[in-house]
Amino acid sequence: MADNAFASLFTKLIVDDEEKMTDYYCAVYGLNVVARVGGDAGGMGEPFREVILGTGEAMDGGQTLVMFNFLDRPKPRDQQVILGFVTDDLDALKAKIVANGGKVLGDIFEQTDHGVRVLFAEDPEGALTENVQMLAH
């Protein structure tokens, strides 16, 4: 492995209500709760709660998405990150987004030069997601 390579990737989304957002991401994207952590944020000394989500049932070094709540900070209002998800059925995912309190931003569109169909949406707290389905070759 190269010195700058990494074995896995995790993303932390700062949220207002980690439980509500956990329910949303599990229902829409099929993720599972693999761990819950709370306490003081290490060297920062701030109270926090987080729920770690993954595609498996345990922390196995794979990719995770963490719903992270700083308990004493003002809640985020601006877009800090765009979460990207790849799916086999973008139309079905669109229905799940709406059914679970998300908001669709425009119609599904094709970017044939990139070989994808794309749908932008917001989760119930307004975080932006880019949802992609690969086009058949």
What is the predicted role of each segment?
Residues 2, 12-61:
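Core segments of cupin and vicinal oxygen chelate
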Residues 2-4, 9-13, 94-137:
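Vicinal oxygen chelate
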Residues 8-9, 78-82:
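Eukaryotic phosphotyrosine signaling hubs
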Residues 21-24, 90-96:
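Short amphipathic alpha-helices within nucleic acid-binding modules
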Residues 40-45, 73-75, 110-113:
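A short beta-turn/loop motif at secondary-structure boundaries
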Residues 47, 79, 115:
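Exposed loop/turn and edge beta-strand positions of beta-sandwich/beta-sheet ligand-binding modules
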Residues 50-52, 84, 118-120:
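Short hydrophobic/aromatic beta-strand element in the GNAT-like acyltransferase core
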Residues 70-74, 135:
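Short, solvent-exposed aromatic-acidic interface loops
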